[in-house]
Amino acid sequence: MADLLSSLKNLSNGSGVYQYFDKNRQLLYIGKAKNLKKRIKSYFSIHNNEITPNHRTSLRIQMMVKQIAFLETILVENEQDALILENSLIKQLKPKYNILLRDDKTYPYIYMDFSTDFPIPLITRKILKQLGVKYFGPFTSGAKDILDSLYELLPLVQKKNCIKDKKACMFYQIERCKAPCENKITKEEYLKIAKECLEMIENKDKLIKELQLKMDRLSSNLRFEEALIYRDRISKIQKIAPFTCMDLAKLYDLDIFAFYGKNNRAVLVKMFMRGGKIISSAFEKIHSLNGFDADEAMKQAIINHYQSHLPLMPEQILLNACSNETLKELQEFIYHKHSKKITLNIPKKGDKLALIEIAMKNAQEIFSQEKTSNEEEILEEVRSLLNLECVPYRVEIFDTSHHANSQCVGGMVVYENSAFQKNSYRRYHLKGSNEYAQMSELLTRRALDFAKEPPPNLWVIDGGRVQLNIALETLKSSGSFVEVIAISKEKRDSKAYRSKGGAKDIIHTMSDTFKLLPSDKRLQWVQKLRDESHRYAINFHRSTKIKNMKQIALLKEKGIGEASVKKLLDYFGSFEAIEKASEQEKNAVLKKRN
């Protein structure tokens, strides 16, 4: 406590970010302040050099303050810089008492560029510099389904570069394009098609009606497989915005955020209204053992969503909960980022209050649907058994694969919300000379990416205590808090045999080893994760090996033998790099002379 007391007596009055640590130097919390001295001292009461929590703070904060042993600060130029740095560090370091919202992606927009002679609908996530561009969105899902439908229903120019070819392609032959490249349609006639396209984007019901007619025609002609494609597409487009029955007389452009939470679970709902209609919506489920602060959750949600330059900005942002201080901070952040003054408002009456109530109703409904399942019970049992600080709601699992230290690869699979999240899987080509070096490289590369993709609650490593220690060292170097376990086969004659049916799995933690019965559901849960990572890494290794064998065969055809191929691979690192290298560079590696 002497270190903490000394730090509290020497605080700066400047803007910056503060970090609280416990006695083991584990990061507890990251915050930002316009005046660091004033903000940090608001957490504590100091009497006769004794530090206690400020009783005016919440019970959650008081519980955290009791654990604080050290604090560190980072000074920045102004409060805006502090806000951005705080958000970045929370994502990267995942402190115990901060709320981490993972949904920080930029949603896609559909746009049409009417400055061109023959405009077509395309997808973008950024602002385009051309004049005459009309945007629609954001779409939290279904943008590609809408786009595919438009191209199939209307005789639009099918590709961006079609006009330059000056020759009609197969789309003209199958009556999917009017071939403006050969002047078979005038600009004025094509503009009518483009305007019909606009109507379908703006009026989802009209688009769905046309798709249903197409589906019915296909079914009548016994083309059932094609009809099923349209059925699935209609279903996806219908789910884009479940609130489209809301149609206000006033043509509001609004973004709506509602937060609802109890105990260790919460839901954040986002709704996007354009021209008085809800066009899309999304939600995020959040879990935390240490409770929630609605103000903090809302702040992170707003920063995540508006940190990128967006094609369409709302007139107002509606929230269901936020302190006046945070509202002011966020308004300044958005103005600083987008050079546009947008009001953040907590409505008290009228249409806008009705919108917030709809968002809240949906948040509560989503919250109530997520009842305690067998999976959640197992997660809690796993946490208790392995003495984890957090329930492992999001898990990343790692495995490597190689053959005689060649074609070395690694795989990361992700498990969240009771399912494997295949869109988050990652594959890595590795250079390590042995399995330990390969695992170290794999984990280091993942840790270096924490700023872009925040760390999970838990890492599961396919390996023993050596691999576990490699993971712990990697995380220590990164400064991020992630709990780690490893799972391996028991050793026989000092060797681990994965293929031996009788060999039992052992779970390793930092301080303990667990040998559970094969029927134990906690072991089976960890095994399920390990098996998926092993399958993913093995499959990637096999595909890499096949690809490399083809590349070796091609090089042999060029008169390069296997020994020379090995030299080239050792030097250039990959077959792709060998292909790009000049003959002079290859000869230099092989020490050939002209």
UniProtKB/Swiss-Prot annotation:
GO biological process: nucleotide-excision repair; SOS response
Molecular function terms from GO: DNA binding; excinuclease ABC activity
Compartments reported by the entry: Cytoplasm
PROSITE patterns: GIY_YIG (PS50164), UVR (PS50151), UVRC (PS50165)
Domain of life, per lineage: Bacteria
One annotated Gene Ontology cellular component of this protein: excinuclease repair complex
Domain GIY-YIG intervals: 13-99
SMART domains: GIYc
Chief location: cytoplasm
Domain UVR: 205-240
Classification via InterPro entries: GIY-YIG_endonuc, GIY-YIG_endonuc_sf, GIY-YIG_UvrC_Cho, RuvA_2-like, UVR_dom, UVR_dom_sf, UvrABC_protein_C, UvrC
Residues forming coiled coils: none
Signal peptide residues on this chain, from the entry's feature table: none
Pfam families: GIY-YIG, UVR, UvrC_RNaseH, UvrC_RNaseH_dom
NCBIfam families: uvrC
Subunit structure: Interacts with UvrB in an incision complex.
Function comment: The UvrABC repair system catalyzes the recognition and processing of DNA lesions. UvrC both incises the 5' and 3' sides of the lesion. The N-terminal half is responsible for the 3' incision and the C-terminal half is responsible for the 5' incision.
Name under which the protein is recorded: UvrABC system protein C
